[in-house]
Every structure is written in C-alpha cells, then in structure tokens.
C-alpha cells in the first residue's frame, strides 16, 4: 500500500512543478502537503466527510485528488481552476478560501449542522495563531465538538518565517514527541487499575508531571485530544496515525511536521521565494525577468527615510518581503515589526507607537487591511493618530482572484473620518508621497500602491495634497484619473484624438481631500466629464466628486469609469482590465458609447 501511495505522491509532485512553473502559484506549500493530502484521501471519504483548508493555497493536491486532475493545468488562468477553494467550482469545496483564519470558525458551523459527519480542518502553523482560529479553538474545546479533527500542518513558515509564541510552542511540541508515547503508556496503565483511589492519585500525578514537562497540557486543558507526527512526509508514519485518529471522538488535534517545498531542490533551499512564485524555469528555479514594481520603489524609499529618521517604524502582518520591507528589516530589525497574520493587532500596535511619538508605517495588502476595519475606526480615526498606511496590491491583482483583489479599501478609507488618502499615479509621485508622509502629523495617511510595473511622465510637477495636475489640455472632454488609470488613459490618448475626442487629462493623486478649487472653478467648462479609478464603483473616488458637486449646487453629468462589480474573477491583470472595459480598445469603446450613445 505505502509503495503505491509513494508512487502517487511522486506523480503529483511532478505535476505540481510542471504546472506552477508555467502558471505561477503556491508551489512550496503544496509540495509540503502531498503525503498528508494523499493519506487523507486514503483514510477518509472526501465525498462524505467535510474537508476544509485554511487559506486554501495548499489545496492544489486536494483539487487533483478530487474531480479536477484533468483541468489542473488551467489553474490561475482566466476561466480555469481557481487558485483557492471555491464551492462554485466543485462540490468537494465546502467553503470559499483565500484569507487566513476562516476554516476553524466555519468548521464549527459545519460540525454543529452535520453531527454525523466528520469535519477535517487542515490549518497551517501560522494561520492557527490568527485570532479567528484561536477563538474557534476555544469554542470547539469548550463545547467538546466530537466530530472535528484539526490537522495542524507545521512547516515552520507562513510566507516568511513564523513569528510569535505559538510558533515556539509548536516547536516545543514537536521536540516532545517521545513524551507523547510515554503519556499513552501511562494512560493505558492507569486505565487497567481497578482501585479507584489509587487510580485517581495516579491521574493527578500524571497531570502534574505533564504540566511541568510538556506543552500538551495546555492543549488538553482546552478540551482537545492531542497527537503528533514528527515525520509528516513519511507515509509509513503518517498513515497509521490518521487511521488511529479517524474514529476517535474529539475534538482532536493532530500536529503534522512537514517540509515546505519537499521534492524540488530549489523550493527546499528557498522556501520563502517558492511560497508563491511567478512562472519560472524548472531547470534553474529562476523566475523570468520582470520590470520594477511599485513595491520595490516603496522599499527603497522607506529605507532611505529610515536612515534619516530613527523614529520611523515599519509594520507588516506576515508580509515583510511582499510589501517591500525586506531591505528595511535587514538594516533596522529592531524597527521592523512582523506581527504574523494579525492585521488588527498590527494597526492597534501602530496606534500605540504613534501615541508615543513614533512614526509608524503599516504595510499591508489591500485585501488584508479589510480584516482591520474596526481598529482603523476605533483605534486610529477616533484619536486622529498619524499612522501611515501603505496599502499594497490595491486594485485588480490578477491570478490570485476574487479573494485577493484590492477593490474595497478606497471605499472604506473614504468613509472613515480624519483619513487622508493618496493614490500616486507615477513612481515619482509615490516617492514624493512618502517624503510628505515623513512629517505628516495631521492624522492618519493612506498611500495606495498597485500591483503593476512603474510608470512615469516627463516634467512632472510635484505632488501636493488637495491639488491635482493637468497633464494634457483640451476643451470638451475632461478625464480625471487617479492611481493606475492615469497611465491607462495616456496610453489611449493619441487614439482618442484620432477619433475626434478632444481630451483634458488631469492627474488626481489626492483622492481625499479632493481638489475643491479645480472642481469649483474649472469643471463647468467641459461637455463630458469622466472620472477613472481602479476601484469598486460604490462609495468611490467618483462618488466623492458627485457628492461635492451636489453639495455645491453644480449640476454636471459625471461618467464613472470604475469596476462595476465587487467580485472580480482570477486571470491576468491585463485580461481582467479589458473585460471590465478599463483598458485599451474596450475603454475607448466605452468612452465613445458614453459620449455618442453608441460606438463611433
């Protein structure tokens, strides 16, 4: 049996490497859980049992083993398989995934509603330290939900290295493997004793020893039965343990030690790089050369500012490298704080730093700052604290799909009092925005960064808060563009002129506050006014302009060029922008329809 399963694992690993090398994706996490997922498939019934993966980035093997093997080479491509779990894609996917901390709370709901079905939750050693996960564990143990099996995949990594007490705790658990066997022997011995008095005395002694010498007592005191596999990529060790815990009444926690990137030498050597990777050469492990990103521009500039001002602190929630903070973290480790997957904690921590006279920069992806809206309002806005927020991956992100697109943050930042919001349109404006941020003490400041290559224009005027800049001057049609949309409208500027559409193009990096002077004194002279933004159209930049014009008695029709739908699928960023009629010929046709009522 183990020989057949080993061969299956080898075939799956080969498939993973081949497909991810072409499409990009989460290679390291999936290589690490091949044996675990194959053994789960062997022991449990995926049609009857409810299997949940926290985050879902490590569920590629699960997709292959269920009903998607033939389509696996389409993963992360437009209209292909989703990069995460999606109930619309397969009946085997019970809950949408993408963010950390969702699987255990959802498992509680499934377990209560389906008491006769086994609920299996695979959660990473980083995700389990997330507040939502811990809240769910607390409830599961308290209610003694017997049909839940929690499998903690311990590979000692999230995207980067794990941080915090719980990570250290799990390492201690792994190192305590010998005691687990001793504990089982002691329990077996106690259970064979007939004299109740002696039995109770030995049970108290066992609990006392356990509390002093092992970390198991903490888990068991929460109501869990605990088991441990220290060689999680060894089928002969893993399979018997899964069979053992299958029919146990729980709740049960099984800690499985795996190796991230297992079976591909480059992924084993560079675990962080291969956590989530762009297409790469299998023979060398090298990705294909990309242009400079806005995240890199930010990383270089914040390092420069950090050298100038020792009060600057940077914070990220398990995204040090992804947000461009790697150089800063190397140069100033004591001023670069990685909170782990704990966005709300990061925001309130930054508020404490700001309250103490420091200059905190919270660097988080747009999709993840959603998880800290309460802290943004309660801990930052109400106190009007000068916390700087660098919101990376704003707008459409592409292949990671609907759970990762950054299309909501602008809407809620515009709604929260005291926030200033900047959407730089060029890399120079980003650098200028960061320079301004260093001594900005008027309240919280947001700087949005897209997942895009950098763009610049010649003879660019300096960025000013509350002021916009005319880039092209026309007479009939006004285009007010923020963020990435300046680059996009300038790309079609010549073609618009060729089609008889005269254009004034305004660069609007300052989204909040608006350039009220421009709106009051210049907007009336244009026949058609377009506001372009890469954000969900509801409560957006264009909404703010409409509200301002209405409040000042200015009656003008505003054409809103934005994302019409809140849920954007996965695919290449360029493809999705064109589908949304936000780029190229599709945008030109959209503009023509708005001006002429039809395509010209």
Where are each of the predicted segments found?
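Conserved short loop/turn motifs at secondary-structure junctions
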Residues: 22-26, 123-127, 228-235, 364-369, ...
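Thiamine diphosphate
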Residues: 74-106, 112-116, 142-273, 289-291, ...
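Helix-enriched interaction subdomains in cytosolic or periplasmic regions
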Residues: 279, 414-458
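Extended, hydrophobic alpha-helical segments in both membrane/secreted and soluble proteins
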Residues: 119, 123-124, 128, 132-136, ...
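Cofactor-binding active-site loop characterized by glycine-rich and histidine/acidic residues
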Residues: 18, 25-146, 311-312, 317, ...
